[in-house]
Amino acid sequence: MSNIYDLANELNRTFRELPEYKAVLESKAAIDADSEAKSLFDDYIAFQGKIQQLMQTGQMPTPELQEEMKSFGEKIQANAIVTEFFTKQQQLSVYLSDIERIVFEPIQDLMK
């Protein structure tokens, strides 16, 4: 039987070979090559971290933060480079969801 860590590392390598993964990498490179897209992306990631911290402490976003979320959504939709990145990332996330379901199935079986 294979070592479980060897299997996990093989999954890591295989995941990186997926066309969808490579498409996300290409989209990220396009963001990095465009100063406007890079600035928007970096600002959004920082804002997203701020919102996650707030939610982890049990707080809800204020109306001002909700308005800022809406504004980011509009800016992202207006920027084709950033929009493409998030579209490609979502396509890749289908694999992650499937893998997560498969990996955690034995743990769920223990709870039955």
From Swiss-Prot:
| Superkingdom field | Bacteria
The residue stretches assigned to a coiled coil in this entry are none
Annotated family: Belongs to the UPF0342 family.
Q: Which HAMAP family match?
A: UPF0342
This one is known as UPF0342 protein SGO_1370
